[in-house]
Amino acid sequence: MKSLDIPKQFINVDGKPIIIRTLENFASHPDVDDIVISCLADKIEYMWQLIGQYKVSKVTSIVPGGENGHGSIHNGLVEVQKFSDPGDIVLICDGVRPLISQSLISDCIETATKYETAVPVTPSIDSVLQSEDGETCCKSLPRKQMYITQAPQGYTMRKIMHAHNEAERLGITNPISSSELLIELGETVHIFKGERDNIKVTTPEDLRFLRSRYYYKSFKNFAKEELKYGL
């Protein structure tokens, strides 16, 4: 999804680009020490300008993205590896999740610290059908066993770098997510409760939902001021 030919992470919502709102959630968390951004190569200078403009703290570096999501994550991890230890926790997140809560970040860190892997999920509320041709369905999957993955996903540097090294060795070039990569490599991935509001802004409907959330928040704040001053 693009708006006026702008990459979706740079779309302005209630006065700030989506990616800035996403970054602020991590920058304000007391257990997050450093932030590394993997960004479109031709947007790196612009990204630094935004970070300065909105005074986002803890951003230590911005690296060029890869040919796909997996490549972008890999480039970011290589940068993080320069100043981290194998047991350190790294949180991997899309730049278009501006509604991440502080408690979700805390739960991710806690789960990854305990199990080395942490993936937030929400139970599927709809029935899930499997189709091989996109026209007919051959299997109904048990809804009670179906979960929708979210981000941030947390891993020890040891665990996620090993997965990326194995992917390179085996020629795995474009897994959908880090959790999918680990599962494909035979690893067990630990899940924890995610949040339904933690949307990945992908469609025009997502953008409308996001804007309505900030509009409602602004309206509530205005109403409080009216009551405070008796307007």
Task: Name the predicted role of every residue range.
Residues 33-35, 116-117, 188:
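Residues at the starts of beta-strands that form the adenosine-phosphate
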Residues 12, 99, 140, 154, ...:
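Short aromatic/basic micro-patch
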Residues 67-134, 150:
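Conserved beta-loop-beta/alpha segment of the NTase-like Rossmann-fold superfamily
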Residues 1-45:
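N-terminal glycine-rich phosphate-binding loop and ensuing alpha1 helix
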Residues 146-231:
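Conserved alpha/beta core of the MobA/IspD/sugar-nucleotide pyrophosphorylase nucleotidyltransferase superfamily
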Residues 29-31, 52-59, 83-84:
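Short helix-capping segments at alpha-helix termini
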Residues 55-70:
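Conserved donor nucleotide-binding strand/loop of the catalytic core
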Residues 23-27, 51, 80:
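Hydrophobic C-terminal alpha-helix "anchor/cap" residues
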